[in-house]
């Protein structure tokens, strides 16, 4: 979802 954001770049 928020790919690129720290600390958890989650790919949903």
Curated annotation (Swiss-Prot):
Pfam families assigned: Periviscerokin
Record PTM Glycine amide, positions in chain: 12
Predominant localisation class: secreted
Protein's UniProt keywords contain Transit peptide: no
Keywords in alphabetical order: Amidation, Neuropeptide, Secreted
One Gene Ontology cellular component annotation held by this UniProt entry: extracellular region
Intracellular or extracellular location(s): Secreted
Biological processes annotated in GO: neuropeptide signaling pathway
Functional description taken from the UniProt entry: Mediates visceral muscle contractile activity (myotropic activity).
Entry's family note: Belongs to the periviscerokinin family.
Protein name according to UniProt: CAPA-Periviscerokinin-1
Lineage per the UniProt record: Eukaryota, Metazoa, Ecdysozoa, Arthropoda, Hexapoda
């Amino acid at each position: 979802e928020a790919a690129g954001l720290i600390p958890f770049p989650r790919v949903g």
